[in-house]
Amino acid sequence: MRIELKAIGLVRTNAQKLPRHWSVSDVEGTLVIDEEYLEGLRDIEAGQRIVVIFHFHRSPAFSPEMLLQTSGQSGKEMGVFSICSPVRPNPIGISVLEVLGTRGANIDVRRLDMLDGTPILDIKPHIEEMPG
């Protein structure tokens, strides 16, 4: 099965060093969304958390020998699906970001763990617990 995804925008940040995970990040930047998706940004507000799905565009091509990798956190060899490595069969990442504000098709955020130029695939609201 072939699946095609289209970027809806990209990340802009001046940060040179990034933490390995959004949960320990104070890095700020901007999600620059393509104008054709502007209407879809309605109701995103400062103080809200959003889930950003992105493409690890600088990761090397995946091969079977990468199924086991050394965890950056524990130093142990672990299965790729049990760690947060950017080297994956499908180079897709997920981060929960704090919205600082919006300006047209730009969303200013904090907690970035993405490089400048990272393609954004989707944005969803962060919902702690579904009502009902």
Predicted regions and their residues:
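Glycine-rich, low-complexity intrinsically disordered segments
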Residues: M1-G132
